[in-house]
Design a protein with these regions (language model features):
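Short, small-residue-biased leader/transition segments that mark boundaries at the very start
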Residues: 1-4
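Glycine-rich adenosine-cofactor-binding loop
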Residues: 10-17
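Short, polar loop motifs at secondary-structure junctions
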Residues: 34-40
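Conserved N-proximal alpha/beta basic substrate-recognition cap immediately N-terminal to
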Residues: 43-126, 362-368, 381
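Active-site nucleotide/adenylate-binding loops and adjacent lid/helix of ATP-dependent enzymes
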Residues: 105-181, 201, 230-242, 246, ...
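Peripheral (often C-terminal) accessory segments that flank ATP-dependent C-N-forming ligase machineries
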Residues: 116, 133, 301-398
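Glycine-rich phosphate/pyrophosphate-binding beta-alpha loops
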Residues: 150-152, 276-292, 355
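Phosphate-binding core of ATP-grasp and ATP-grasp-like enzymes
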Residues: 171-179, 186-230, 238-271, 276-284, ...
Length: 398
C-alpha cells in the first residue's frame, strides 16, 4: 500500500504561514491547518482545514489527538506558540514544554528570567489594575505594554504620570492575560536589532541580525522594515550571540526557532528585549534565506517532525530587506505604484489588501497593507531607499 504520509498540524493560515505550508507540501507531508478565519489564504493550500482558534489549547489538542498528527508547528505567530507547546507536551510530540515557551512569550516572565540569571534588564513591574501603580516607583519616561500582545500592538511611551492611566487601559485592551507591564525606557544607541535564529539540541546553530526600521511619523514602535545585515562590530555581535545562546541554554529550550529583539545602550550594554519562541513574521525568514541561503522555514517544519536540517550559511555581498507598505492615516486602499526612481530589485511581494479595502493607520502589524522583499547592490542603496521610501513607492489611500 501507500507509504504512510507524515502529518503536520500548522497553526494559522495567513500569508505568513504560507511558506511553512508550501514547504511541508513540497516534502510530501499531509498538511492540516486550523484557525477561526476560513478565508485565510493558506487553508486552500493545505490538505485539511478545521475552524478552530489557534489560541484554544484544548480544542487544538482534541483535534491533534483525533487526527493523530506527527507534529504541530507554530510559525510566525506569537499567540499560537503556547498552544503548539501545550499540544506537543501532552501528546509527546517533538517540541518544548508549555511552561518553558510561556516564559519566553510573556514579557513579565521573560524579564524575571533575565533578572534571575544576571542579564541586563530594564526595571519592569507587571500590574493587573491601574490603581496598583505607585507613581513614586517610576522615573519617566516609561514604556507601557501588554505582557502578551503580538505585532507591537498596545504599546505606549509615557513621559508623565498624567498619561499613565490611559496608556494602561490601552495596553490592557490588547492583553489576553489582562496583565500590563511598565518598564524603564531603555535609551538605546543605534537601531533596534532584530532577526531570527535556530537553537538545536544543545547549541545555537544559526542566528542572523538585521536592523529594525520604524516610521517615526506614526508611532515609532511598529517595525515597517528590517535591513540585513545589521552593522555591528564583530565584538558586539559576538557578545549578543553569547547572551542569546546563554539565555536559551539556561531556559532548557531546544530545537527552537526564534525571533529576536535586542537593544544596545550608550555603555554598550546588551538588552535581550525579546526572544520570541517562533520564527518572525513579516517574511523575515524569507529575507534571511535570500541573504544567507539558510532555509529557516525548512528548519522549523522539520524540527516539528523531529528531523534536523544541516545549516550552511553562504557569504553574500548584497543587502536585503523587507518593507511593509503602510498608511499614516486611515482610509480606503487604492493600490501602490513603483516610481520611475525605483531602481532596486524586488525579490518577492505579498499584498494583503484588495483595491477598495479599508485600512487603518499603522499602529500594529495587523494594519500592514503588504510586504516587499528587496535586494540592494550595496548598503548605500539600501539606506537611500529607507531614508525616504515614499520617494520610490507611492501608496494611494483615499
Amino acid at each position: 500500500g501507500d507509504v504512510y504520509k507524515r502529518q503536520i498540524l500548522i497553526l494559522g493560515g495567513t500569508h505568513f504561514q504560507i511558506p511553512a505550508i508550501k514547504y511541508a507540501k513540497s516534502r510530501g507531508y499531509h498538511v492540516i491547518t486550523c484557525d477561526y478565519l476560513p478565508d485565510n489564504p493558506g487553508h486552500k493550500l493545505a490538505d485539511e482545514y478545521y475552524n478552530i482558534s489557534t489560541t484554544d489549547k484544548n480544542a487544538v489538542l482534541a483535534l491533534a489527538r483525533s487526527l493523530s498528527v506527527d507534529g504541530i508547528l507554530c510559525f510566525a505567530s506569537d499567540p499560537a506558540a503556547p498552544t503548539a507547546a501545550y499540544v506537543s507536551e501532552v501528546l509527546g510530540l517533538p517540541g518544548n514544554t508549555f511552561d518553558n515557551i510561556c516564559r519566553f512569550g510573556e514579557k513579565h516572565l521573560w524579564r524575571q528570567f533575565l533578572r534571575e540569571n544576571g542579564f541586563n534588564v530594564p526595571k519592569a513591574i507587571p500590574y493587573q489594575r491601574a490603581e496598583d501603580i505607585d507613581v513614586a516607583d517610576w522615573c519617566f519616561p516609561v514604556m507601557v505594554k501588554p505582557v502578551d500582545s503580538s505585532g507591537s500592538k498596545g504599546i505606549t511611551k509615557v513621559t508623565s504620570a498624567l498619561d499613565l492611566k490611559s496608556a494602561f487601559d490601552y495596553a490592557l485592551s490588547y492583553s489576553r492575560l489582562k496583565i500590563v507591564l511598565i518598564e524603564e525606557f531603555v535609551e538605546r544607541v543605534g537601531p533596534q536589532i532584530g532577526g531570527d535564529g535556530f537553537y538545536g539540541k544543545d547549541k545555537l546553530e544559526f542566528v542572523c541580525y538585521g536592523e529594525q526600521v520604524v516610521d517615526e511619523r506614526i508611532n515609532g514602535y511598529v517595525p515597517c522594515g528590517m535591513k540585513f545585515p545589521a552593522l555591528l562590530s564583530s565584538s558586539l555581535e559576538q557578545r549578543i550571540t553569547h547572551d542569546i545562546e546563554r539565555a536559551i541554554r539556561l531556559s532548557g529550550l531546544h530545537d527552537l526557532s526564534f525571533n529576536l529583539e535586542v537593544m544596545i545602550d550608550k555603555a554598550e550594554n546588551i538588552y535581550l528585549m525579546e526572544i520570541g519562541p517562533r520564527n518572525g513574521g513579516n517574511c523575515i525568514p524569507e529575507v534571511i534565506q535570500y541573504y544567507t541561503d539558510v532555509n529557516l522555514v525548512a528548519i522549523a517544519v522539520e524540527a516539528a517532525l523531529g528531523n534536523s536540517v544541516p545549516v550552511c550559511p553562504s557569504n553574500n555581498t548584497k543587502c536585503y530587506a523587507y518593507y511593509a507598505l503602510h498608511a499614516s492615516k486611515e482610509g480606503i486602499y487604492r493600490g501602490y505604484e513603483l516610481e520611475k526612481t525605483f531602481r532596486f530589485n524586488i525579490r518577492n511581494s505579498y499584498i494583503f489588501l484588495k483595491n477598495g479595502d479599508k485600512i487603518g493607520a499603522f499602529l500594529g502589524s495587523n494594519q500592514t497593507i503588504g510586504i516587499l522583499l528587496l535586494e540592494f547592490d550595496s548598503r548605500k542603496e539600501m539606506d537611500t531607499f529607507f531614508d525616504s521610501p515614499e520617494r520610490y513607492v507611492s501608496l494611494y489611500i483615499e
